[in-house]
Design a protein with these regions (language model features):
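Conserved SAM-binding loop of SAM-dependent methyltransferases across substrates and taxa
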Residues: 106-118
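Conserved beta-strand signature within the Rossmann-like core of class I S-adenosyl-L-methionine
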Residues: 201-208
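A short acidic, Gly/Pro-enriched loop at the edge of an enzyme's catalytic core
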Residues: 94, 161-173
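Core SAM-dependent methyltransferase catalytic element
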Residues: 228-229, 242-264
Length: 264
Protein backbone atom coordinates (compact mmCIF):
# COMPACT_ATOMS: atom_id res chain seq x y z
CA UNK A 1 0.00 0.00 0.00
CA UNK A 2 1.39 3.37 -1.03
CA UNK A 3 0.41 6.75 0.42
CA UNK A 4 -1.82 8.91 -1.75
CA UNK A 5 -1.47 12.56 -0.83
CA UNK A 6 -3.53 13.64 -3.83
CA UNK A 7 -2.82 16.79 -5.78
CA UNK A 8 -3.39 20.38 -4.74
CA UNK A 9 -4.91 20.81 -8.21
CA UNK A 10 -7.18 17.75 -8.60
CA UNK A 11 -7.69 16.10 -11.98
CA UNK A 12 -11.40 16.79 -11.62
CA UNK A 13 -10.65 20.52 -11.75
CA UNK A 14 -8.62 20.09 -14.94
CA UNK A 15 -11.27 17.86 -16.52
CA UNK A 16 -14.01 20.31 -15.57
CA UNK A 17 -12.21 23.18 -17.26
CA UNK A 18 -11.48 21.03 -20.31
CA UNK A 19 -15.16 20.13 -20.55
CA UNK A 20 -16.13 23.77 -20.28
CA UNK A 21 -13.68 24.62 -23.05
CA UNK A 22 -15.21 22.02 -25.36
CA UNK A 23 -18.74 23.26 -24.65
CA UNK A 24 -17.73 26.87 -25.26
CA UNK A 25 -16.03 25.92 -28.53
CA UNK A 26 -19.07 23.96 -29.73
CA UNK A 27 -21.28 26.93 -28.89
CA UNK A 28 -18.87 29.18 -30.78
CA UNK A 29 -19.08 26.96 -33.85
CA UNK A 30 -22.84 26.36 -33.71
CA UNK A 31 -24.08 29.80 -32.70
CA UNK A 32 -21.41 31.95 -34.25
CA UNK A 33 -18.92 30.64 -36.77
CA UNK A 34 -21.28 28.53 -38.89
CA UNK A 35 -24.19 30.92 -38.87
CA UNK A 36 -26.54 27.98 -38.44
CA UNK A 37 -28.56 29.68 -35.71
CA UNK A 38 -27.83 33.41 -35.63
CA UNK A 39 -27.27 35.96 -38.36
CA UNK A 40 -26.12 39.55 -38.48
CA UNK A 41 -25.47 41.29 -35.16
CA UNK A 42 -26.58 38.35 -32.94
CA UNK A 43 -24.14 36.11 -34.79
CA UNK A 44 -21.31 38.62 -34.31
CA UNK A 45 -22.08 38.83 -30.58
CA UNK A 46 -22.08 35.02 -30.32
CA UNK A 47 -18.73 34.83 -32.12
CA UNK A 48 -17.18 37.38 -29.75
CA UNK A 49 -18.66 35.98 -26.52
CA UNK A 50 -18.06 32.30 -27.14
CA UNK A 51 -14.77 32.90 -28.95
CA UNK A 52 -13.33 34.84 -26.04
CA UNK A 53 -14.86 32.38 -23.58
CA UNK A 54 -13.21 29.48 -25.37
CA UNK A 55 -9.80 31.16 -25.30
CA UNK A 56 -10.10 32.03 -21.60
CA UNK A 57 -11.16 28.51 -20.65
CA UNK A 58 -8.41 27.04 -22.84
CA UNK A 59 -5.84 29.18 -21.04
CA UNK A 60 -7.02 28.13 -17.59
CA UNK A 61 -7.22 24.48 -18.64
CA UNK A 62 -3.60 24.57 -19.77
CA UNK A 63 -2.53 26.44 -16.64
CA UNK A 64 -4.31 24.06 -14.28
CA UNK A 65 -2.89 21.06 -16.15
CA UNK A 66 0.61 22.51 -15.76
CA UNK A 67 -0.02 23.08 -12.05
CA UNK A 68 -1.26 19.52 -11.66
CA UNK A 69 1.92 18.13 -13.24
CA UNK A 70 4.14 20.41 -11.15
CA UNK A 71 2.49 19.47 -7.85
CA UNK A 72 2.25 15.74 -8.60
CA UNK A 73 3.98 13.74 -5.84
CA UNK A 74 4.93 11.11 -8.42
CA UNK A 75 5.80 13.53 -11.20
CA UNK A 76 9.08 14.99 -12.34
CA UNK A 77 9.02 18.33 -10.46
CA UNK A 78 7.33 17.16 -7.24
CA UNK A 79 6.98 20.71 -5.94
CA UNK A 80 4.45 19.67 -3.28
CA UNK A 81 6.93 17.18 -1.86
CA UNK A 82 9.71 19.78 -1.93
CA UNK A 83 7.57 22.28 -0.03
CA UNK A 84 6.29 19.74 2.51
CA UNK A 85 9.75 18.42 3.32
CA UNK A 86 11.25 21.90 3.34
CA UNK A 87 8.65 23.12 5.84
CA UNK A 88 8.73 20.00 8.02
CA UNK A 89 12.45 20.28 8.67
CA UNK A 90 11.76 23.41 10.73
CA UNK A 91 9.28 21.55 12.96
CA UNK A 92 11.19 20.49 16.07
CA UNK A 93 9.38 18.86 18.98
CA UNK A 94 10.90 17.70 22.27
CA UNK A 95 10.65 14.01 23.14
CA UNK A 96 7.20 13.32 24.52
CA UNK A 97 5.90 16.59 23.11
CA UNK A 98 3.06 17.28 20.69
CA UNK A 99 2.93 19.26 17.46
CA UNK A 100 -0.03 20.59 15.48
CA UNK A 101 -0.52 20.85 11.72
CA UNK A 102 -3.32 23.30 10.95
CA UNK A 103 -5.26 22.49 7.79
CA UNK A 104 -3.58 19.14 7.27
CA UNK A 105 -5.45 18.19 4.07
CA UNK A 106 -4.28 14.68 3.18
CA UNK A 107 -1.81 14.54 6.07
CA UNK A 108 1.44 15.04 4.14
CA UNK A 109 3.00 17.69 6.41
CA UNK A 110 1.68 16.06 9.59
CA UNK A 111 3.21 12.72 8.65
CA UNK A 112 6.54 14.15 7.49
CA UNK A 113 6.89 16.14 10.72
CA UNK A 114 6.03 13.00 12.70
CA UNK A 115 8.78 11.09 10.89
CA UNK A 116 11.29 13.76 11.84
CA UNK A 117 10.17 13.69 15.48
CA UNK A 118 9.67 9.96 16.19
CA UNK A 119 9.54 10.40 19.97
CA UNK A 120 6.85 13.06 19.77
CA UNK A 121 3.25 13.10 18.53
CA UNK A 122 1.85 15.10 15.63
CA UNK A 123 -1.80 16.12 15.44
CA UNK A 124 -3.34 17.10 12.12
CA UNK A 125 -6.55 19.10 12.10
CA UNK A 126 -8.78 20.18 9.23
CA UNK A 127 -12.43 20.83 8.47
CA UNK A 128 -12.22 18.55 5.39
CA UNK A 129 -15.02 20.36 3.59
CA UNK A 130 -15.65 22.67 0.67
CA UNK A 131 -14.24 22.16 -2.81
CA UNK A 132 -11.70 19.57 -1.67
CA UNK A 133 -13.89 17.46 0.61
CA UNK A 134 -13.98 14.56 -1.86
CA UNK A 135 -10.18 14.58 -2.17
CA UNK A 136 -8.90 15.40 1.31
CA UNK A 137 -10.52 13.47 4.16
CA UNK A 138 -9.68 12.31 7.66
CA UNK A 139 -9.70 8.70 6.46
CA UNK A 140 -7.21 9.54 3.72
CA UNK A 141 -4.92 11.06 6.34
CA UNK A 142 -5.15 7.95 8.49
CA UNK A 143 -4.62 5.67 5.48
CA UNK A 144 -1.55 7.65 4.43
CA UNK A 145 -0.07 7.43 7.92
CA UNK A 146 -0.64 3.67 7.90
CA UNK A 147 0.94 3.37 4.45
CA UNK A 148 3.98 5.31 5.66
CA UNK A 149 4.25 3.16 8.78
CA UNK A 150 3.89 6.23 10.99
CA UNK A 151 2.07 5.66 14.27
CA UNK A 152 2.89 8.82 16.23
CA UNK A 153 0.12 10.81 14.55
CA UNK A 154 -3.58 11.41 15.00
CA UNK A 155 -6.12 13.45 13.10
CA UNK A 156 -9.06 15.46 14.33
CA UNK A 157 -11.54 18.00 13.03
CA UNK A 158 -10.59 21.60 13.65
CA UNK A 159 -11.16 24.99 12.05
CA UNK A 160 -8.19 27.34 11.63
CA UNK A 161 -10.45 30.31 12.36
CA UNK A 162 -11.21 29.04 15.88
CA UNK A 163 -8.98 26.13 16.82
CA UNK A 164 -10.60 23.71 19.30
CA UNK A 165 -7.58 23.71 21.59
CA UNK A 166 -6.66 25.55 24.76
CA UNK A 167 -3.94 28.17 24.90
CA UNK A 168 -0.39 26.79 25.02
CA UNK A 169 -1.42 23.23 24.11
CA UNK A 170 1.38 22.34 21.67
CA UNK A 171 5.16 22.28 21.55
CA UNK A 172 5.19 23.12 17.84
CA UNK A 173 2.73 24.39 15.24
CA UNK A 174 2.95 24.25 11.48
CA UNK A 175 0.83 24.80 8.40
CA UNK A 176 1.18 24.92 4.63
CA UNK A 177 -0.81 27.05 2.18
CA UNK A 178 -3.94 27.20 4.33
CA UNK A 179 -4.73 30.74 5.47
CA UNK A 180 -4.86 32.35 2.02
CA UNK A 181 -7.77 30.02 1.21
CA UNK A 182 -9.84 31.32 4.12
CA UNK A 183 -11.85 34.25 2.80
CA UNK A 184 -13.39 36.96 4.91
CA UNK A 185 -10.83 36.77 7.72
CA UNK A 186 -7.79 38.86 8.56
CA UNK A 187 -4.79 36.67 7.78
CA UNK A 188 -2.65 38.02 10.61
CA UNK A 189 -5.44 37.19 13.05
CA UNK A 190 -5.46 33.64 11.68
CA UNK A 191 -1.72 33.40 12.28
CA UNK A 192 -2.19 34.66 15.83
CA UNK A 193 -4.91 32.07 16.41
CA UNK A 194 -2.45 29.33 15.47
CA UNK A 195 0.28 30.84 17.64
CA UNK A 196 -2.21 31.07 20.53
CA UNK A 197 -2.11 27.30 21.01
CA UNK A 198 1.71 27.20 21.00
CA UNK A 199 3.54 26.83 24.31
CA UNK A 200 6.17 29.30 25.42
CA UNK A 201 9.45 28.04 24.01
CA UNK A 202 7.67 26.11 21.26
CA UNK A 203 8.63 26.38 17.60
CA UNK A 204 6.55 27.34 14.59
CA UNK A 205 6.90 26.91 10.83
CA UNK A 206 4.05 28.39 8.81
CA UNK A 207 4.21 28.48 5.01
CA UNK A 208 1.73 30.47 2.98
CA UNK A 209 1.16 33.26 0.48
CA UNK A 210 2.08 36.32 2.54
CA UNK A 211 2.11 39.20 0.10
CA UNK A 212 1.09 42.63 1.48
CA UNK A 213 -2.17 42.39 -0.49
CA UNK A 214 -3.09 39.17 1.32
CA UNK A 215 -1.52 39.53 4.76
CA UNK A 216 -0.71 43.20 5.22
CA UNK A 217 2.66 44.32 6.53
CA UNK A 218 4.36 41.08 7.59
CA UNK A 219 7.56 42.86 8.60
CA UNK A 220 5.50 44.81 11.13
CA UNK A 221 3.90 41.52 12.21
CA UNK A 222 7.35 40.05 12.87
CA UNK A 223 8.29 43.11 14.93
CA UNK A 224 5.05 42.76 16.88
CA UNK A 225 5.80 39.15 17.80
CA UNK A 226 9.31 40.06 18.90
CA UNK A 227 7.92 42.90 21.01
CA UNK A 228 5.55 40.41 22.65
CA UNK A 229 8.51 38.32 23.77
CA UNK A 230 8.98 35.74 21.05
CA UNK A 231 12.56 34.47 21.22
CA UNK A 232 13.02 34.24 17.48
CA UNK A 233 10.93 35.23 14.46
CA UNK A 234 12.02 35.09 10.82
CA UNK A 235 10.40 35.41 7.42
CA UNK A 236 11.96 33.39 4.61
CA UNK A 237 11.07 34.06 0.98
CA UNK A 238 10.52 30.56 -0.41
CA UNK A 239 9.79 31.84 -3.91
CA UNK A 240 13.33 33.10 -4.38
CA UNK A 241 15.28 29.87 -4.66
CA UNK A 242 14.39 27.87 -1.53
CA UNK A 243 11.37 25.96 -2.87
CA UNK A 244 11.06 27.57 -6.31
CA UNK A 245 12.52 30.48 -8.26
CA UNK A 246 10.78 33.78 -8.94
CA UNK A 247 9.86 32.90 -12.52
CA UNK A 248 8.30 29.58 -11.54
CA UNK A 249 6.45 31.09 -8.59
CA UNK A 250 4.97 33.78 -10.85
CA UNK A 251 3.87 31.24 -13.47
CA UNK A 252 2.29 29.06 -10.78
CA UNK A 253 0.56 31.93 -9.02
CA UNK A 254 2.67 31.36 -5.90
CA UNK A 255 4.56 34.66 -5.79
CA UNK A 256 4.67 35.94 -2.23
CA UNK A 257 5.21 32.49 -0.71
CA UNK A 258 6.87 32.95 2.67
CA UNK A 259 7.87 30.73 5.56
CA UNK A 260 7.28 32.23 9.00
CA UNK A 261 9.52 30.42 11.47
CA UNK A 262 10.70 30.95 14.99
CA UNK A 263 10.40 30.21 18.67
CA UNK A 264 7.81 31.59 21.07
Amino acid sequence: MKPDYKNWVPKSMVYGLAGGTVIAFLAFMLLGATGAVFHGTPRLIAVIVFGIGTLILLFFTGWMAALHRTFDYNGKRKLSKTIIEGTAKYVTIPDGGTGLDVGCGSGALTIDAAKRNPKATMVGCDIWSGAYKAVFTKKRCEDNAKAEGVTNVRFTEGNAVHLPFADASFDAVTSNYVYHNISGHDKQKLLLETLRVLKKGGTFAIHDLMSPARCGDMDAFVKRLKAEGYEEVRLIDTADGLFMNKKESALLGLAGSMLLIGKK
